[in-house]
């Protein structure tokens, strides 16, 4: 039959590529679960009173090429000026071998946080490299595997300083007056909720205040000056005051390590190591401390341990400090950090090595010296006599200078009184320096780069001798071996091959939404129009970004039912914090500052209580009933008891137990009745989009995990984006920014991230996803996520009981498999099943959350029936193996489950097990075989023998 042109054009082709099951597969799966259609299934599962009467107005789907063309036109409105603004952001030259083999490689960007170390050894090694770089450059004993950005790291440093301080009565934190303004902004915000007083002044004035528990210094100062803080930090140490230093990672290549000068905590942005500015992010922050403070440190830490065979293996160490275990008592609410960006920065150091980094840093400094010499020769006055890469130049008519710079396509720092700032970088050329001479001295400046270069050799050093680094850096072989592109490419490939990511198999982690990150969505993040903009450039140069953010915000308003979106939070945890801050500030604006109690169901994710504590709230736990639902009687009692102290409730929907609670609107009404606000955690938005919205349900604020629901990849543990949606009454109280004004936000509202729009350069991913799916496609995605979960639950429920179900025995987009009865009867645990799945070629589901002894499975809409059946068949085969243990065919201490996973090395070694080699390593055939590089990790050994630096190459 002849098809029409409209039929052949088929605008919805991307929807069919994003959604895994074909139409025929969907029909089969519906028949298995006992539903006639997707709409009928949703009617059985989602409470009728919260289902949307009409679809969200986000438009129809565009094809991949149409969406890319639209976004390219929007990106073209951004103007790519040379930005010498500095303030913690610099242009970079990302090595193409890293761009191609890491940033554009799904083996790196689709992986999850390495909770399962046996399938994560590649990126764990990459993160260990990053930690080694941090330790070497900071001169401290222990480093984390990244934080969200430099300003957030500063706030974490302040919080840590208070935790480790022996001055328990001190409540003041001193900040030197040459710290970056955006850093001070975020520190003030955090101090507000902790009840700390921020004191700003000259660094030496810190000694004048006896009530200070910690001090924040900056090396290099925001205006470019270098400091020798050795004497100051020695004096502070004598008074038991904690010294924190924000550092420039490139400058540290040449400068004395702050740890050697006496700093207790050192942090900064790793952006300069190969990561584009991206209008503010994402960028990894580095963070280091002294060994005696290791248990007070925030963020992930990678440690060296051993596996069951006694071989060296890596894992996340000291997890008991973190929110998923300690909840409101955690060191931080940080969950996702910036792993992909930390890996890029670490690999930048691996590729260039110590000598290459010294050349890069030395060239930047030399060009700065040449620029300084020329400007001085031309009659201009510099504010400082020492510098690394940044000059502050006195000018008579600042506006005229800035205007002339713009005419040259150049941005200078503009917020300094009677002066302009210039920060050079690795992308700066000789021609760029000549252009700066022309801007500041006129076209007839007559200066010659070569002559200036020769002349400055005879002048005083602009890095004082006492600040020059004397010790070696990056002496480990990993930083001295892979300097040819061939070797680097192979090293990156070897690491990626050790990991299990979405490019090999589904990752059925509950509460994580490991869906497709389509190639068309990823392409725009490498476009220079998005990658090269400075976050503090003039707004008229970022019209494309502003348009894209405005469109995306408009779509998210429709999809959430809220009135406004704040894009600043650069992780889900930051979104929670920002949303709770908005609630806190709203209450304060109504003279109800006494509202400090936050109700949280016992099933909540660990970030919820950790974020509430960070926002200055006290947590009251609400019970759940036997079905996993919020106990309304307990909620009503606790809301009533809280009375005028009730601030809010934090609730996840569908619940963390994987069901749509029928009484969610009543929950909202009860909290509102007692004057509280409803924070609806957006972790499970993938089961809401197009079906219902938080606003329609009755919530006041939510964060959205764009790295889950809206297709930004997890990157092995970051980047993330956690924008918040708010009702109109909360909109004035979302985070502001002291450097870049944000429309509609009260100017006094402090920031939660360094950049005004968070990790703006990954927002095109979510823009592309929504544009290519349209309203109907987004609804189908939610429906298919729900169908896939119910299909798994139906097929597995006889082998593994589904712990919680809703109406008609249905689950939402994820299901919890109860392993506890099996463990009681056979001794086989959820851990054994998780590790045995590796032999079948799968990443494990989420273990023991939200209920100990369970596995939580979330398939997402992107997995086909073929892949889901492969997972189900693996789980059923494992159940049969458990039966063989129960029947005594295999002993409890020697069977394929407790010995899992099995490695290639074990396959060729002597074999004394009561099961065959083939069953061990090819339980489901060889087509989808994944080979783990290590056996099961020894967690106890790793924490008892903490070692968080690179190990000898012979150990790998």
From Swiss-Prot:
An MF annotation (GO) of this entry: pyridoxal phosphate binding
Enzyme class of the recorded protein, top EC level: oxidoreductase
Reactions catalysed, as given in the entry: N(6)-[(R)-lipoyl]-L-lysyl-[glycine-cleavage complex H protein] + glycine + H(+) = N(6)-[(R)-S(8)-aminomethyldihydrolipoyl]-L-lysyl-[glycine-cleavage complex H protein] + CO2
Top-level taxon: Bacteria
Keywords: Oxidoreductase, Pyridoxal phosphate
Pfam families from the UniProt entry: GcvP2_C (PF21478), GDC-P (PF02347)
Cofactors (names): pyridoxal 5'-phosphate
Any single Gene Ontology cellular-component annotation: glycine cleavage complex
GO biological process: glycine decarboxylation via glycine cleavage system
N6-(pyridoxal phosphate)lysine sites (modified residues): 708
EC number(s) from the headed UniProt entry: 1.4.4.2
Subunit field text: The glycine cleavage system is composed of four proteins: P, T, L and H.
Summary of the function given for this chain in its UniProt record: The glycine cleavage system catalyzes the degradation of glycine. The P protein binds the alpha-amino group of glycine through its pyridoxal phosphate cofactor; CO(2) is released and the remaining methylamine moiety is then transferred to the lipoamide cofactor of the H protein.
Similarity comment: family membership: Belongs to the GcvP family.
Protein name listed in UniProt: Glycine dehydrogenase (decarboxylating)
Name of the gene encoding the protein in the UniProt record: gcvP
């Amino acid at each position: 039959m002849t098809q029409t042109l409209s039929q052949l054009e088929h605008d919805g082709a991307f929807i069919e590529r994003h959604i895994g099951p074909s139409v025929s597969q969907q029909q089969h799966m519906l028949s298995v679960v006992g539903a006639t259609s997707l709409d009928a299934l949703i009617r059985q599962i989602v409470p009728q009173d919260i289902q949307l009467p009409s679809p969200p107005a986000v438009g129809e789907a565009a094809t991949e090429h149409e969406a890319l063309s639209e976004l390219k036109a929007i990106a073209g409105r951004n103007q790519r000026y040379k930005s010498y603004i500095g303030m913690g952001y610099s242009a970079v030259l990302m090595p193409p071998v890293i761009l191609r083999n890491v940033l554009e490689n799904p083996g790196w960007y689709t992986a999850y946080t390495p909770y399962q170390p046996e399938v994560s050894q590649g990126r764990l090694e990459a993160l260990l490299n990053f930690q080694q770089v941090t330790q070497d450059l900071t001169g401290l004993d222990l480093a984390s595997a990244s934080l969200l950005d430099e300003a957030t790291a500063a706030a974490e440093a302040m919080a840590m300083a208070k935790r480790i301080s022996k001055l328990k009565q001190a409540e003041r934190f001193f900040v030197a007056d040459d710290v970056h303004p955006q850093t001070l902004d975020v520190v003030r915000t955090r101090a507000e909720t902790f009840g700390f007083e921020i004191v700003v002044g000259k660094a030496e004035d810190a000694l004048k205040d006896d009530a200070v528990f910690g001090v924040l210094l900056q090396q290099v100062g925001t205006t470019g000056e270098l400091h020798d803080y050795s004497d100051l930090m020695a004096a502070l140490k004598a008074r038991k005051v904690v010294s924190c230093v924000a550092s420039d990672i490139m400058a540290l290549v040449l400068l004395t390590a702050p740890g050697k000068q006496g700093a207790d905590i050192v942090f900064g942005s790793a952006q300069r190591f190969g990561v584009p500015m991206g209008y503010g992010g994402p960028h990894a922050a580095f963070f280091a401390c002294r060994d005696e403070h290791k248990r007070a440190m925030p963020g992930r830490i990678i440690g060296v341990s051993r596996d069951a065979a006694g071989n060296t293996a890596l894992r996340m160490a000291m997890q008991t400090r973190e929110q998923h275990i300690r909840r409101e008592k955690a060191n931080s609410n940080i969950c996702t950090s910036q792993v992909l960006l930390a890996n890029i920065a670490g690999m930048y150091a691996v590729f260039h090595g110590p000598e290459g980094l010294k050349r890069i840093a030395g060239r930047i400094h030399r060009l700065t010296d040449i620029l300084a010499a020329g400007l001085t020769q031309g009659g201009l006055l510099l504010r400082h006599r020492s510098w690394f890469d940044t000059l502050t130049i006195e000018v008579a008519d600042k506006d005229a200078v800035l205007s002339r710079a713009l005419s040259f396509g150049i941005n200078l720092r503009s917020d300094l009184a009677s002066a302009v700032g210039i920060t050079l970088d690795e992308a700066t050329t000789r021609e760029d320096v000549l252009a700066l001479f022309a801007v500041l001295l006129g076209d007839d400046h007559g200066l010659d780069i070569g002559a200036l270069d020769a002349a400055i050799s005879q002048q005083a050093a602009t890095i004082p001798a006492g600040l020059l680094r004397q010790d070696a850096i990056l002496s480990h072989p990993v930083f001295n071996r892979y300097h040819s592109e061939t070797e680097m490419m192979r090293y990156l490939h070897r690491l990626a091959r050790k990991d299990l990511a979405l490019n090999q198999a589904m990752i059925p982690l509950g509460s994580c939404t490991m869906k497709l990150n389509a190639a068309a969505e990823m392409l725009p993040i490498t476009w220079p129009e998005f990658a090269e903009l400075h976050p503090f450039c003039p707004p008229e140069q970022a019209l494309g970004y502003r348009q894209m953010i405005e469109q995306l915000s408009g779509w998210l308003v429709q999809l959430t039912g809220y009135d406004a979106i704040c894009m600043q939070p650069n992780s889900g945890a930051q979104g929670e914090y920002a949303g709770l801050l908005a609630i806190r500030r709203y209450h304060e604006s109504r003279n109800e500052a006494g509202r400090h109690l936050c109700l949280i169901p016992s099933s909540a994710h660990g970030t919820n209580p950790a974020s509430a504590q960070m926002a200055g709230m006290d947590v009251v736990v609400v019970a759940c009933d036997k079905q996993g639902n919020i106990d309304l009687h307990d909620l009503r009692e606790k809301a009533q008891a809280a009375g005028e102290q009730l601030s809010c409730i934090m609730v996840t929907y569908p619940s963390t137990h994987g069901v749509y609670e029928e009484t969610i609107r009543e929950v909202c009404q009860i909290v509102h009745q007692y004057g509280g606000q409803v924070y609806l955690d957006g972790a499970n938005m993938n089961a809401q989009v197009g079906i219902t919205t938080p606003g329609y349900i009755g919530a006041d604020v939510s964060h959205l995990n764009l790295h889950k629901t809206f297709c930004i990849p997890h990157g092995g543990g970051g980047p993330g984006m956690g924008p918040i949606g708010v009702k109109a009454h909360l909109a004035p109280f979302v985070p502001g920014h002291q450097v870049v004004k944000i429309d509609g936000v009260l100017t006094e509202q402090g920031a939660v991230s360094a950049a005004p729009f968070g990790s703006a350069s990954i927002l095109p991913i979510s823009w592309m996803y929504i544009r290519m799916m349209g309203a109907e496609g987004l609804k189908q995605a939610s429906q298919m996520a729900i169908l896939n979960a119910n299909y798994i639950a139906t097929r597995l429920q006889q082998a593994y009981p589904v712990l919680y179900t809703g109406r008609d025995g249905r689950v939402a987009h994820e299901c919890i498999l109860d392993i506890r009865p099996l463990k009681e009867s056979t001794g086989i645990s959820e851990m054994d099943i998780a590790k045995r799945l590796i032999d079948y070629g799968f990443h494990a589901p989420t273990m023991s959350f939200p209920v100990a002894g369970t596995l939580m499975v979330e398939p997402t809409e992107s997995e086909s029936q073929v892949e889901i059946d492969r997972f189900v068949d693996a789980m059923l085969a494992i159940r049969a193996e458990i039966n063989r243990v129960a029947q005594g065919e295999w002993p409890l201490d020697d069977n394929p489950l407790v010995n899992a996973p099995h490695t290639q090395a074990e396959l060729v070694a002597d074999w004394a097990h009561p099961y065959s080699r083939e069953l061990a390593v090819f339980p489901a055939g060889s087509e989808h075989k994944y080979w783990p590089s290590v056996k099961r990790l020894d967690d106890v050994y790793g924490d008892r023998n903490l070692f968080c630096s690179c190990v000898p190459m012979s150990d790998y």
